[in-house]
A protein has these predicted regions:
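Glycine-rich, Trp-frequent "lid" loop and neighboring beta-strands that shape
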Residues: 86, 126-176
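FAD-binding core of FAD-dependent oxidoreductases
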Residues: 107-120, 141-152
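Glycine-rich loops and low-complexity Gly/Arg-rich segments
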Residues: 101-104, 121, 172-175
């Protein structure tokens, strides 16, 4: 392949034919299962004092949309590994992520919301068998949520390589 042919291929920003039906299914899922519950979800949460918790009824609404997503095979497709995800390229996922970004509940309904997506990808790529069993499996199943902290005093928080905090096991407890 010549340099010009390689460059032409790199400039092709079209979604693959393989991913187009998935995009159509995602749009349909959002329209039929997420959009109809969104106003009620946020209405139910209006009076809660803690922004990090759910008000009664919110999780039930979201679980209904998640159940439909699972039934329709719209679950964890952001992962590039075809065994745990859909095997999409970053470009194909970008088209889908653009649709997910139009709805405040769409990503969560498909188990594709941050920080879980990044944490699952890290666990999938470099996690130990024990870490995958303990954390990746329940994350992939949508049974737990995860977190990633990367803001520190006097440290640029946009690049995880700059993190200086450490955790040391002392007397059976982790000291941060």
């Amino acid at each position: 392949m010549s340099h010009n042919e390689a460059m032409a291929g790199m400039n092709n920003l079209e979604m693959s034919e393989k991913a187009k039906p998935l995009l159509a299914a995602v749009i349909k899922h959002i329209r039929e299962n997420v959009d109809p519950i969104t106003d009620e979800y946020f209405r139910l949460g209006e009076g809660r004092a803690d922004r990090w918790s759910h008000a009664p009824g919110q999780l039930e609404l979201l679980e209904t949309a998640k159940k439909k997503a699972r039934e329709n095979g719209l679950w964890n497709f952001f992962l590039p590994n075809a065994e745990t995800g859909e095997g999409l390229s970053n470009l194909d996922y970008a088209y889908i992520a653009a649709e997910l970004g139009k709805s405040p509940l769409a990503s969560e309904s498909l188990n594709c919301s941050a920080p879980d997506t990044g944490n699952m990808e890290v666990l999938e790529r470099i996690g130990t068998a024990e870490q995958k069993e303990k954390w990746l499996k329940p994350l992939l199943a949508g049974e737990i949520r995860s977190a990633f902290a990367m803001t520190e005093p006097d440290m640029a928080s946009s690049d995880a390589k700059n993190i200086s905090t450490s955790a040391v096991l002392e007397n059976g407890e982790w000291v941060i």
